[in-house]
Amino acid sequence: MKAVVLAVAVLFLTGSQARHFWQRDDPQTSWDRVRDFATVYVDAVKESGRDYVAQLEASLGKHLNLKLLDNWDTLSTTFSKLRSELGPVTQEFWDNLEKDTEWLRQEMNKDLVEVKEKVQPYLKNFQEKVQLELEHYRKKVEPLGTDLRDGARQKLQELQEKLTPLGEDLRDRARQHVDELRAQLGPYSDQMRQRLTQRLEALKDSASLAEYQAKAQEHLKTFSEKAKPALEDLRLGLLPVLESLKASFLSSIDEVSKKLSAQ
């Protein structure tokens, strides 16, 4: 488990963009980030799992002649092969879905762009007001900082008393600006929600959505057909491992039974 935790921690701490900074690659897609995370996680599980199996074989497996470590390596090889075979198929599936839903994203973006243009002046005005408030607060606090440096500890209590009402005033004025912005953007939020609802309702009965559903089902069917050979290879690869474990276990039970009968 330590290897798994370490792998996940390293992935999140370094970030998905870290390697692109050094390699100068293009930004990753969502699928690339998911695939990289899954690869790191599976490799970590495989390594930590092998360590655990080795410990188990040392304590128990040798007595029962289970050959756990050999079977684990066989399983790891089988799953690695499955992952490499399904990788291109899965990538193709998501690429096709992304291409087929491009029209849907474009329809949604039309409304978003229109609303963004309308609310931009309010956001800009809000930002300017906040900056003015901060500048006003800074000018009021600056002389107090000078007094503190001159009077040192003696004026610390006095400075705190002066800063408290200034901070409260800044907080109240900021809340006022936020409430004002919320009131200004409220109608646009409602409008956007209504238009999005109307757009989705229209899409339910549209030929485009029906066509997309048909394509999605077709992609799923294609994915299933292409993945079937890889899954069959996995099943065939697991059979010898399971048979080996079964034979070893039965042999061990038979040996133990003979020893007990001889006593």
Swiss-Prot record:
| Function per UniProt | Participates in the reverse transport of cholesterol from tissues to the liver for excretion by promoting cholesterol efflux from tissues and by acting as a cofactor for the lecithin cholesterol acyltransferase (LCAT). As part of the SPAP complex, activates spermatozoa motility.
Residue stretches spanning the membrane: none
Location of the protein in the cell? Secreted
What is the protein's given name? Answer: Apolipoprotein A-I
Entry-linked InterPro entries: ApoA_E, Apolipoprotein_A1/A4/E
Determine if Nucleotide-binding is one of this entry's keywords: no
Gene Ontology CC: chylomicron; endocytic vesicle; extracellular vesicle; low-density lipoprotein particle; spherical high-density lipoprotein particle; very-low-density lipoprotein particle
Q: Which portions of the sequence form the region 10 X approximate tandem repeats?
A: 66-263
**Family of this protein:** Belongs to the apolipoprotein A1/A4/E family.
Task: Kindly indicate where the leader peptide sits in this chain.
Answer: 1-18
> Which residues form the sequence repeats?
66-87, 88-109, 110-120, 121-142, 143-164, 165-186, 187-206, 207-228, 229-239, 240-263
- Mind listing the UniProt keywords for this protein, alphabetically? Cholesterol metabolism, Glycoprotein, HDL, Lipid metabolism, Lipid transport, Lipoprotein, Oxidation, Palmitate, Phosphoprotein, Repeat, Secreted, Signal, Steroid metabolism, Sterol metabolism, Transport
GO BP: any one term: amyloid-beta formation
Fill in the PTM field for this protein. Answer: Glycosylated.
